[in-house]
């Protein structure tokens, strides 16, 4: 591992941090250390990192802004690549938008709404990166990334870079081909938006923000929606009907505001959260006969 660290530093791939606690990089404020954390300066740094990872046969993981993510208390083995400042370029040409995978989604939706571009209003309260949003087909307010994405530039595990069209992304509810058949890193996304009335777009954005602020616990560290909605039900409704609202294990608590959110009340461990998730799954299955599946991504040792 020491030799890999030295080569990464010599290759100038970006910031190289050893045994770096990941709690500071997630919205849940939970997570043990990464053996090696890379914050790349540019795409070339990611490419070189993957070359060295392959050379040393080391595991690797990619994270964005750390939303919708639960990292194990034991951390993550191998190399963790955090997308951000090196992939935050933006190009707007009429209604076509090309944006780096590390660009903050809320910042993008706000900026484009002020320019009178419609289509990203649903993302006004999603605290992730563009890359992460494309990866998991993030959505809210009856819309999602699949409705606006035309293509995405992907760096695949073997080091090749290629564009995937909307069809090739194989989007479905909170999933894409990147989670299943073709793992890779979203370097860039191209969105097709609509030119609209600025005042109306900004108004919709504000309504969406107000709704999230009034119904979801964004004043506490959390990872967003914990479970996917098991059609035709809503996960939060089932959890609340089961009487689990406010239930707490350690520092992790099912939110009083919304049953599908688990908050970190202070000092929560990943195990606290996992125990709550297991409790919810079993309770919902026993009471309603419904299988619950997590939307939050659980990673680590």
Curated annotation (Swiss-Prot):
Catalysed reaction equations from the record? UDP-N-acetyl-alpha-D-muramate + NADP(+) = UDP-N-acetyl-3-O-(1-carboxyvinyl)-alpha-D-glucosamine + NADPH + H(+)
Q: Which domain of life is it from?
A: Bacteria
Q: Where in the cell is it found?
A: Cytoplasm
Q: Extract one GO molecular function annotation from the record.
A: UDP-N-acetylmuramate dehydrogenase activity
| Top-level EC class as recorded in UniProt | oxidoreductase
Q: What is its EC number?
A: 1.3.1.98
- Give the required cofactors: FAD
Give an example GO biological process: cell wall organization
Describe which pathway this protein belongs to, using the record's wording: Cell wall biogenesis; peptidoglycan biosynthesis
**What Pfam families does this protein map onto?**
FAD_binding_4, MurB_C
Q: Which InterPro entries match?
A: FAD-bd_PCMH, FAD-bd_PCMH-like_sf, FAD-bd_PCMH_sub1, FAD-bd_PCMH_sub2, MurB, MurB_C, MurB_C_sf, Oxid_FAD_bind_N
Keyword field: Cell cycle, Cell division, Cell shape, Cell wall biogenesis/degradation, Cytoplasm, FAD, Flavoprotein, NADP, Oxidoreductase, Peptidoglycan synthesis
Q: Which GO terms describe its cellular component?
A: cytosol
Query: FAD-binding PCMH-type domain spans which residues?
Result: 29-196
Q: Which residues form the active site?
A: 174, 225 (proton donor), 295
Supply the HAMAP family for this chain.
Answer: MurB
Similarity-based family: Belongs to the MurB family.
> What is the protein's known function?
Cell wall formation.
Protein name per UniProt: UDP-N-acetylenolpyruvoylglucosamine reductase 1
């Amino acid at each position: 591992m020491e030799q890999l660290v030295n080569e990464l530093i010599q290759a100038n791939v970006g910031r190289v941090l050893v045994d770096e606690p990941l709690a500071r990089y997630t919205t849940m404020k939970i997570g043990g250390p990464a053996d090696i954390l890379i914050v790349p300066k540019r795409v070339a740094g990611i490419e070189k990192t993957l070359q060295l990872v392959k050379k040393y046969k080391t595991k690797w993981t990619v994270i964005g802004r750390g939303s919708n993510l639960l990292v194990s208390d034991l951390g993550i083995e191998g190399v963790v690549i955090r997308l951000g400042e090196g992939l935050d370029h933006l190009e707007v040409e009429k209604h076509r938008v090309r944006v780096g995978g590390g660009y903050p989604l809320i910042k993008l939706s706000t900026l484009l709404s002020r320019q009178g571009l419609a289509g990203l209003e649903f993302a006004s309260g999603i605290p992730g990166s563009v890359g992460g949003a494309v990866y998991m087909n993030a959505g809210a307010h009856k819309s999602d990334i699949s409705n606006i994405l035309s293509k995405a530039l992907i760096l695949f595990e073997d080091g090749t870079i290629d564009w995937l069209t909307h069809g090739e992304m194989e989007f479905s509810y909170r999933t894409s081909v990147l989670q299943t058949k073709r793992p890779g890193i979203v370097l860039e996304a191209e969105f097709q938006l609509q030119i609209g009335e600025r005042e109306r777009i900004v108004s919709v954005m504000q309504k969406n923000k107000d709704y999230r602020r009034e119904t979801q616990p964004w004043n506490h560290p959390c990872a967003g929606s914990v479970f996917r909605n098991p059609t035709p039900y809503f996960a939060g409704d089932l959890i609340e009907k089961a009487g689990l609202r406010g239930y707490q294990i350690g520092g992790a608590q099912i939110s009083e505001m919304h049953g599908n959110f688990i908050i970190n009340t202070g000092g929560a461990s990943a195990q606290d959260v996992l125990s709550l998730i297991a409790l919810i799954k079993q309770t919902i299955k026993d009471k309603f006969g419904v299988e619950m599946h997590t939307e939050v991504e659980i990673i680590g040792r």
